[in-house]
Amino acid sequence: MDKHHNHECNGHECNHVQVDSVTQSLDELNFERGIWGSIINSDFKKVEQLLYKNSSLSNTMDSSGYYPLHYAVRNDKNNDIVQLLLDNGANINCQTSGGATPLHRSCFCNSINNTKLLLKKGITKVDLIDSDGMTPLHKAYQQGNMEIVNLLLQFGADPNILDKNKMKPIQLLK
């Protein structure tokens, strides 16, 4: 029997299908039962239990190259989970294989509270670029979120960095 769950990022609803464990791959089972699935489901208590048993899970990459913090920062309702991960040693500047940081993800998903939290926690690398040459400021302008743009600028983001298409962040404003 298929089970559907929904989550939202950047105004786009994702409809993932959960299928009986008989047909799930090991990667899917690991994700669903691990810290990443608990974060996607905003299950603070489960994340807390998992981290209590093994705090190194806060820096464990999934099979797609994402860390728990990448999932948590996508949605402001996970602000307490973001804080919990950071309190348990999550690397605030961790990068996916495509170079995206948690700050890239929070900016792209318009997660204002998580962006504020990341910046206030002392991100020192506000201008890390991803595989497209984009900084978090590029992502914020791309989404048209001026509140996040202004936050990034207040924390020293460089508005003159060019992405791979030779575009400054402001040129991506919708």
From Swiss-Prot:
Per UniProt, the keywords (alphabetical) are: ANK repeat, Repeat
Which InterPro entries does the UniProt entry name for this protein? Answer: Ankyrin_rpt (IPR002110), Ankyrin_rpt-contain_sf (IPR036770)
Which SUPFAM superfamilies does the UniProt record give? Ankyrin repeat
Where does the record place its ANK repeats?
Answer: 64-94, 98-128, 132-161
- Presence of keyword Repeat: yes
Q: Which domain of life is it from?
A: Eukaryota
The family classification in the record reads:
Belongs to the ANKRD39 family.
The record's PANTHER family line, in alphabetical order, gives: ANKYRIN REPEAT FAMILY A, CHROMOSOME UNDETERMINED SCAFFOLD_25, WHOLE GENOME SHOTGUN SEQUENCE
What is the name listed in the Swiss-Prot or TrEMBL entry for this protein? Answer: Ankyrin repeat domain-containing protein 39 homolog
Protein's gene: ankrd39
